[in-house]
Protein backbone atom coordinates (compact mmCIF):
# COMPACT_ATOMS: atom_id res chain seq x y z
CA UNK A 1 0.00 0.00 0.00
CA UNK A 2 2.80 2.43 0.86
CA UNK A 3 4.48 2.04 -2.55
CA UNK A 4 1.19 2.67 -4.36
CA UNK A 5 0.61 5.78 -2.25
CA UNK A 6 4.15 7.02 -2.95
CA UNK A 7 3.73 6.49 -6.69
CA UNK A 8 0.39 8.29 -6.58
CA UNK A 9 1.98 11.30 -4.86
CA UNK A 10 4.85 11.29 -7.35
CA UNK A 11 2.44 11.26 -10.30
CA UNK A 12 0.46 14.12 -8.76
CA UNK A 13 3.65 16.14 -8.32
CA UNK A 14 4.56 15.49 -11.97
CA UNK A 15 1.09 16.56 -13.12
CA UNK A 16 1.22 19.70 -10.98
CA UNK A 17 4.63 20.58 -12.40
CA UNK A 18 3.25 20.16 -15.91
CA UNK A 19 0.30 22.46 -15.18
CA UNK A 20 2.55 24.97 -13.41
CA UNK A 21 4.82 24.85 -16.44
CA UNK A 22 1.95 26.01 -18.62
CA UNK A 23 1.83 29.24 -16.63
CA UNK A 24 5.60 29.43 -16.50
CA UNK A 25 5.99 29.29 -20.28
CA UNK A 26 3.92 32.43 -20.68
CA UNK A 27 5.93 34.23 -18.01
CA UNK A 28 9.21 32.97 -19.49
CA UNK A 29 8.32 34.24 -22.95
CA UNK A 30 7.70 37.67 -21.43
CA UNK A 31 11.12 37.57 -19.71
CA UNK A 32 9.60 37.94 -16.26
CA UNK A 33 11.45 37.32 -12.99
CA UNK A 34 9.74 33.99 -12.28
CA UNK A 35 9.47 31.79 -15.34
CA UNK A 36 9.07 28.18 -16.34
CA UNK A 37 11.19 26.48 -13.70
CA UNK A 38 9.92 28.59 -10.82
CA UNK A 39 6.27 27.96 -11.67
CA UNK A 40 6.91 24.24 -12.13
CA UNK A 41 8.73 23.95 -8.82
CA UNK A 42 6.12 25.89 -6.88
CA UNK A 43 3.24 23.84 -8.31
CA UNK A 44 5.15 20.62 -7.67
CA UNK A 45 6.06 21.60 -4.12
CA UNK A 46 2.45 22.47 -3.35
CA UNK A 47 1.25 19.10 -4.68
CA UNK A 48 3.96 17.28 -2.74
CA UNK A 49 3.22 19.01 0.56
CA UNK A 50 -0.53 18.44 0.23
CA UNK A 51 -0.02 14.88 -1.04
CA UNK A 52 2.22 14.06 1.89
CA UNK A 53 -0.62 15.21 4.14
CA UNK A 54 -2.29 11.85 3.57
CA UNK A 55 0.86 10.00 4.61
CA UNK A 56 1.38 12.23 7.63
CA UNK A 57 -2.24 11.80 8.74
CA UNK A 58 -2.01 8.05 8.29
CA UNK A 59 1.27 7.90 10.22
CA UNK A 60 -0.09 9.85 13.17
CA UNK A 61 -3.27 7.79 13.34
CA UNK A 62 -1.24 4.94 14.77
CA UNK A 63 -2.24 4.00 18.31
CA UNK A 64 0.84 5.49 19.97
CA UNK A 65 0.16 8.97 18.52
CA UNK A 66 -3.63 9.25 18.73
CA UNK A 67 -3.76 10.99 22.09
CA UNK A 68 -0.75 13.22 21.41
CA UNK A 69 -1.41 14.71 18.01
CA UNK A 70 -4.26 15.69 15.77
CA UNK A 71 -3.50 16.19 12.10
CA UNK A 72 -5.15 19.10 10.30
CA UNK A 73 -4.55 18.94 6.53
CA UNK A 74 -5.75 22.53 6.10
CA UNK A 75 -2.61 23.67 7.93
CA UNK A 76 -0.52 22.18 5.14
CA UNK A 77 -2.41 24.29 2.62
CA UNK A 78 -1.92 27.36 4.81
CA UNK A 79 1.82 26.64 4.94
CA UNK A 80 2.00 26.38 1.15
CA UNK A 81 0.19 29.69 0.72
CA UNK A 82 2.43 31.42 3.28
CA UNK A 83 5.62 30.13 1.66
CA UNK A 84 4.52 31.05 -1.83
CA UNK A 85 3.42 34.46 -0.63
CA UNK A 86 6.96 35.03 0.60
CA UNK A 87 8.48 33.99 -2.74
CA UNK A 88 5.90 35.98 -4.71
CA UNK A 89 6.61 39.10 -2.68
CA UNK A 90 10.19 38.91 -3.90
CA UNK A 91 9.03 39.41 -7.49
CA UNK A 92 7.29 42.72 -6.75
CA UNK A 93 9.36 45.83 -7.35
CA UNK A 94 8.51 49.43 -6.72
CA UNK A 95 9.86 52.07 -9.05
CA UNK A 96 11.05 55.58 -8.30
CA UNK A 97 7.60 57.02 -8.87
CA UNK A 98 4.79 56.21 -6.47
CA UNK A 99 2.64 54.72 -9.24
CA UNK A 100 5.39 52.42 -10.57
CA UNK A 101 4.94 48.86 -9.36
CA UNK A 102 6.01 45.83 -11.36
CA UNK A 103 5.85 42.11 -10.76
CA UNK A 104 2.29 41.91 -9.44
CA UNK A 105 1.13 39.65 -12.27
CA UNK A 106 4.12 37.36 -11.82
CA UNK A 107 3.48 37.22 -8.07
CA UNK A 108 -0.17 36.42 -8.75
CA UNK A 109 0.74 33.70 -11.23
CA UNK A 110 3.02 32.09 -8.62
CA UNK A 111 0.14 32.01 -6.16
CA UNK A 112 -2.08 30.47 -8.86
CA UNK A 113 0.63 27.88 -9.62
CA UNK A 114 0.58 26.91 -5.95
CA UNK A 115 -3.22 26.73 -5.95
CA UNK A 116 -3.11 24.50 -9.03
CA UNK A 117 -0.55 22.32 -7.24
CA UNK A 118 -2.83 22.10 -4.22
CA UNK A 119 -5.74 21.07 -6.47
CA UNK A 120 -3.63 18.33 -8.05
CA UNK A 121 -2.36 17.32 -4.61
CA UNK A 122 -5.92 16.51 -3.57
CA UNK A 123 -6.66 14.86 -6.95
CA UNK A 124 -8.88 17.64 -8.30
CA UNK A 125 -7.53 17.32 -11.86
CA UNK A 126 -10.49 18.86 -13.67
CA UNK A 127 -10.21 21.97 -11.50
CA UNK A 128 -6.43 22.09 -12.02
CA UNK A 129 -6.73 21.81 -15.80
CA UNK A 130 -9.56 24.33 -15.98
CA UNK A 131 -7.75 26.86 -13.80
CA UNK A 132 -4.55 26.38 -15.83
CA UNK A 133 -6.44 27.18 -19.02
CA UNK A 134 -8.13 30.19 -17.43
CA UNK A 135 -4.78 31.50 -16.18
CA UNK A 136 -3.16 31.21 -19.60
CA UNK A 137 -6.11 33.05 -21.10
CA UNK A 138 -5.79 35.82 -18.54
CA UNK A 139 -2.02 36.07 -18.92
CA UNK A 140 -1.83 35.92 -22.72
CA UNK A 141 -5.12 37.31 -24.00
CA UNK A 142 -5.56 40.06 -21.44
CA UNK A 143 -2.01 41.29 -22.03
CA UNK A 144 -2.91 41.92 -25.67
CA UNK A 145 -6.12 43.65 -24.62
CA UNK A 146 -4.21 45.82 -22.12
CA UNK A 147 -1.79 46.91 -24.86
CA UNK A 148 -4.66 47.87 -27.16
CA UNK A 149 -6.37 49.87 -24.41
CA UNK A 150 -3.24 51.80 -23.41
For each of these PLM feature ranges, what is it?
Residues 1-76, 128-130, 144:
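Alpha-helical transmembrane segments and their membrane-interface boundaries
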Residues 14-17, 84, 108, 132-133:
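Residue-level signal for the membrane-embedded core of alpha-helical transmembrane segments
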Residues 21-33, 87-99, 141-147:
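C-terminal ends of transmembrane helices
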Residues 41-51, 105-119:
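Small-residue-rich segments of transmembrane alpha-helices in multi-pass membrane proteins
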Residues 71-79, 100-103:
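Internal alpha-helical transmembrane segments of multi-pass membrane proteins
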Residues 75-92:
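Hydrophobic, membrane-facing alpha-helical anchors
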Residues 119-129:
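Transmembrane helix interruption/hinge and helix-loop junction motifs
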Residues 129-137:
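Alpha-helical transmembrane segments of multi-pass small-molecule/ion transporters
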Amino acid sequence: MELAQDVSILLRVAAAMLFGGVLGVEREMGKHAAGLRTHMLIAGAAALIVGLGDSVAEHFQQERYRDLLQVDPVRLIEAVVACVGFVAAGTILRGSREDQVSGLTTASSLIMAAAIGIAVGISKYVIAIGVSVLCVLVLAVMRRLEKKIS
